[in-house]
């Protein structure tokens, strides 16, 4: 296939027991997410009185409905930790591996709580993130040995820079990653002891340090400034150069390209390590790809082996110890834990090449990347999977011509059941960035309210636990837009 596979691509029914990936499969014509029957979230009341029910729900739920499946986050973290542990053992790699959650992908409380509970270190990038870290400290969820990585722009005197100093007083393992020399005075004058990271300008395709310097990116320090910053940190009382940060891209699905981009940063780390022996962590940042379509193919173990082996080779050449490895996993951690379910409310032929299935929500508001970037996500029916399919187009309920799926000019076909009564469908792999970009509890395009949200977890015995968060009310939407506020108007004469 030369196009992203976003769902079923045949007119025939889907066989019972068919598995789309490691968490979506078919049971008697209905779609299951792990052990959760998604169809029965909506159809419970329509089945026999003694039919399936879920503890804590016991009734049909409204559509649209957002699903937050927390066990998936734990599975993803555990899987990556196991991958790097296997690679370390196979290669005899002397350094450690640190898994950090990049919180900008999804900063919801239940997500942060789950990542910390799964043993992840914590990465942040804004002043509000610092407040979140304080809340996690107060609740006993951020242990003293857990690293907090402070990325983002934080010039001296800004609220973010000042908040980092406050957090350092409460949490010892805080590492500010310097983006610009203007960030150093706050650390130098604080009277506090800091382990410090330096972000190198490494983003984008390159084969050596010169090409990294030439690339047009606002992130990180160029080579000359990097070395200058390292000397300042090393000479400063109370500061210790600890981390080199070299992020090279986002959603990099080609292992060869990923390692090719990381090689010059690893060489820079080794040269720095020759001069500054306190430097011990190589942080490759983000870029780890996540499966958002059904054709996803990336060998995480092969990547880990290649990365560690490359570090061994380069560090051996420069006669320095291999570094501890850190990755900041945002999309990888959260993409698959989130899904968004809708009901097909009408079908329009409209003399189109394929019939329009109109859903009871907005595609472009719920998944901004579909219209802004032409991004693809998995779309599957929850019901009627044992019935014939046809190729269709999806339309959102808004009056916007961009509220469609597949994205405009996409080569990917979308097939859904011909039978449309009680036809529910889900978008999957949408748990990273989409809700944050769309604005949580904010005002949506065409004044659509935010959907209800079902948070799903499991206890130690594997029993499901549910928490249903109500969607926005009309009053909340109007209040966001200022209609429930009495405004003082001041008239002026010209």
Question: What residues fall within each predicted segment?
Answer:
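N-terminal capping/small domains of soluble enzymes
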Residues: 1-157, 379, 391, 405, ...
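Charged (often Lys/Glu-rich) extended helix/loop segments that serve as interaction or gating elements
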Residues: 11, 38, 57, 306-308, ...
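Flexible, glycine/charged-enriched surface loops at secondary-structure junctions
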Residues: 63, 89-94, 275-281, 317-326
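Conserved, mostly hydrophobic/aromatic
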Residues: 73, 104, 126, 198, ...
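Active-site-proximal beta-alpha core segment in soluble small-molecule metabolic enzymes
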Residues: 92-281, 290, 310
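Short connector loops at secondary-structure junctions
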Residues: 245-249, 282-287, 390, 395-400
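A glycine-rich phosphate-binding loop feature that marks nucleotide/adenosyl-phosphate handling sites
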Residues: 247, 281-289, 322-334
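Short glycine/threonine-rich loop-to-helix capping motif typified by GTGT followed
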Residues: 253-260, 291-303, 334-346, 409-411
């Amino acid at each position: 296939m030369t196009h992203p596979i976003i769902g079923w691509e045949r007119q025939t029914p889907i066989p019972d027991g068919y598995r789309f990936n490691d968490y979506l499969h078919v049971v008697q014509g209905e779609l299951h997410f792990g052990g959760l029957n998604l169809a029965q979230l909506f159809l419970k009341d329509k089945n026999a009185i003694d039919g399936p029910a879920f503890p804590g729900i016991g009734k049909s739920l409204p559509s649209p409905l957002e699903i937050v499946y927390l066990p998936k986050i734990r599975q993803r973290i555990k899987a990556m930790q196991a991958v790097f542990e296997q690679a370390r053992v196979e290669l005899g790699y002397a350094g450690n591996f640190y898994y950090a959650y990049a919180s900008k992908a999804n900063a919801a409380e239940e997500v942060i709580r789950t990542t910390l509970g799964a043993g992840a270190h914590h990465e942040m990038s804004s002043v509000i993130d610092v407040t979140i870290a304080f809340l996690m400290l107060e609740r006993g969820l951020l242990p003293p040995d857990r690293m907090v990585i402070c990325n983002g722009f934080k010039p001296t005197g800004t609220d973010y820079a000042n908040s980092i100093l406050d957090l350092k007083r409460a949490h010892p393992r805080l590492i500010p990653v310097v983006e610009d020399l203007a960030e150093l005075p706050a650390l130098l004058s604080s009277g506090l002891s800091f382990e410090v990271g330096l972000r190198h300008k490494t983003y984008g395709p390159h084969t050596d340090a010169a090409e990294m310097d030439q690339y047009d990116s606002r992130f990180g320090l160029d080579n000359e400034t990097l070395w200058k910053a390292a000397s300042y940190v090393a000479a400063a009382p109370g500061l210790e150069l600890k981390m080199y940060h070299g992020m090279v891209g986002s959603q990099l699905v080609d292992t060869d390209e990923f390692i090719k981009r990381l090689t010059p940063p690893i060489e820079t780390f080794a040269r720095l390590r020759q001069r500054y022996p306190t430097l011990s962590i190589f942080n490759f940042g983000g870029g780890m790809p996540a499966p958002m379509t059904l054709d996803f193919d990336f060998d995480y173990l092969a990547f880990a082996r290649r990365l560690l082996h490359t570090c061994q080779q380069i560090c051996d050449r420069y006669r320095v110890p291999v570094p501890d490895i850190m990755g900041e996993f945002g999309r990888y951690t959260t993409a698959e834990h989130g899904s968004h379910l809708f009901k097909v409310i009408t079908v329009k032929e409209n003399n189109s090449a394929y019939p329009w299935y109109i859903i009871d929500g907005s595609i472009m508001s719920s998944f901004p990347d579909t219209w802004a970037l032409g991004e693809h996500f998995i779309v599957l029916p929850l019901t009627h999977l044992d019935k014939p399919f046809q190729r269709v187009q999806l339309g959102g309920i808004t009056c916007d011509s961009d509220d469609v799926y597949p994205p405009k000019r996409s080569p990917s076909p979308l097939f859904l059941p011909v039978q449309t009564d009680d036809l529910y469908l889900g978008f999957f792999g949408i748990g990273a960035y989409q809700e944050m970009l769309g604005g949580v509890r904010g005002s949506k395009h065409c004044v659509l309210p935010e959907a209800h949200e079902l948070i799903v977890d499991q206890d130690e015995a594997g029993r499901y636990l549910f928490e249903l968060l109500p969607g926005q009310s009309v009053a909340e939407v109007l209040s966001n837009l200022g209609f429930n506020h009495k405004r003082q108007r001041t008239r002026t004469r010209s």
